[in-house]
Curated annotation (Swiss-Prot):
Belongs to the class-II aminoacyl-tRNA synthetase family. Phe-tRNA synthetase alpha subunit type 1 subfamily. CDD domains: PheRS_alpha_core (cd00496). Binds 2 magnesium ions per tetramer. This is Phenylalanine--tRNA ligase alpha subunit. It comes from Corynebacterium glutamicum (strain ATCC 13032 / DSM 20300 / JCM 1318 / BCRC 11384 / CCUG 27702 / LMG 3730 / NBRC 12168 / NCIMB 10025 / NRRL B-2784 / 534).
Length: 340
């Protein structure tokens, strides 16, 4: 190619580049004008066929034309990149003065909140939090807790038994097995709180649910008495329900404690009234339970107690239907979640 034809090819490339509207078009035009099949690259490849005395000038003409086209391509590319960046910024621009709809933030479930509040109270007393499996051996759920073989709590009407029949595995009916496991694996003294899910064959209604949460406490040490139990429950009740709260005990029977009692709580409720409400069970650990875990009841005594989290939440907050706690309706959970 002559110098004139090379300049014409470079001018055509420059004119084409100027007409590109975006980077994709520019890339396509570069392939057309500076790709392998374009005039200037072809002229460069043919330099070897030109007589030696003309090759130097021909090479200079080719390089000048190619350099001019490449330089202009680079300039146009910079302009189009700036244009693209400006368009992207405009699309992504946020007007911070425009009012927005506040996003709803998730929060903990009220049962979880209450569980953590109770755990914090016990930790503040120097107690430890202990947990255990939900699928439990009958030995830990019943035998070691002094339940007789024919106790009604063992039946299918009260307990979920795990297949196959005869496996002696159940869904735990209380968190007391955690106490047994702890006493077997730890040296006394022991002060533990045992939160967790438990399972019973109750129908779901306003006051019952087949899956619910318990918090149980166990203390085993030298010289513990019912007075220590009463003081612990008084402190827990005042922390949960307020400084005006009172507790009382009524004699009862449980296989794993002796003597045993029901504990009631009195406190001003959210509706402006006050009254005694049954809260949970408690008592001194039965000597048979201590012997079953290798603790000498002549040297050590212990007390234990337990209450339902759902029931506590229900009467503390004036809730009429326990089903609201398990059905997942955000209208129920949102007011509690604000506290989280």
């Amino acid at each position: 190619m002559t110098e004139a034809s090379l300049n014409e090819a470079a001018d055509a490339a420059i004119k084409a580049f100027d007409g590109a509207q975006n980077l994709d078009e520019l890339a396509a035009l570069r392939r057309d004008h500076l790709g392998d099949a374009a005039p200037i690259p072809q002229a460069r490849r043919s330099l070897g066929t030109i007589p030696k005395d003309q090759r130097k000038d021909a090479g200079r003409f080719v390089n000048m034309a190619l350099g001019r086209a490449e330089k202009h391509f680079a300039q146009v590319k910079v302009v189009l990149e700036e244009k693209r960046n400006a368009e992207v910024l405009e699309l992504e621009r946020v007007d911070v003065t425009v009012p927005t709809t506040r996003e709803q933030v998730g929060a903990l479930h009220p049962i979880t909140i209450l569980n953590e509040q109770i755990a914090d109270i016990f930790v503040g007393m120097g107690w430890e939090i202990a947990e255990g499996p939900e699928v439990e051996a009958e030995y830990f759920n019943f035998d070691a807790l002094n339940f007789l073989p024919d106790h009604p709590a063992r039946t299918l009407q009260d307990t979920f038994h795990i297949a196959p029949e005869g496996s002696r595995q159940v869904l735990r009916t209380h968190t007391s097995p955690v106490q047994v496991r702890t006493m077997l694996n730890r040296e006394v003294p022991i002060y533990i709180a045992c939160p967790g899910r438990v399972f019973r064959t109750d129908e779901l209604d306003a006051t019952h649910t087949p899956v619910f949460h318990q918090i149980e406490g166990l203390a085993v040490d030298k010289g513990l008495t019912m007075a220590h139990l009463r003081g612990t429950l008084d402190h827990l009740a005042k922390e949960l329900f307020g400084p005006e709260t009172k507790t009382r005990m009524r004699s009862n029977y449980f296989p794993f404690t002796e003597p045993s009692a029901e504990v009631d709580v009195w406190f001003p409720n959210k509706k402006g009234g006050a009254g005694w409400i049954e809260w949970g069970g408690c008592g001194m650990v039965n000597p048979n339970v201590l012997r079953a875990v290798g603790v000498d009841p002549e040297e050590y005594t212990g007390f234990a107690f337990g209450m339902g989290i759902e029931r506590t939440l229900q009467f503390r907050n004036g809730l009429s239907d326990m089903r609201d706690m398990v059905e997942g309706d955000i209208r129920f959970t949102l007011p509690f979640g604000i506290q989280a």
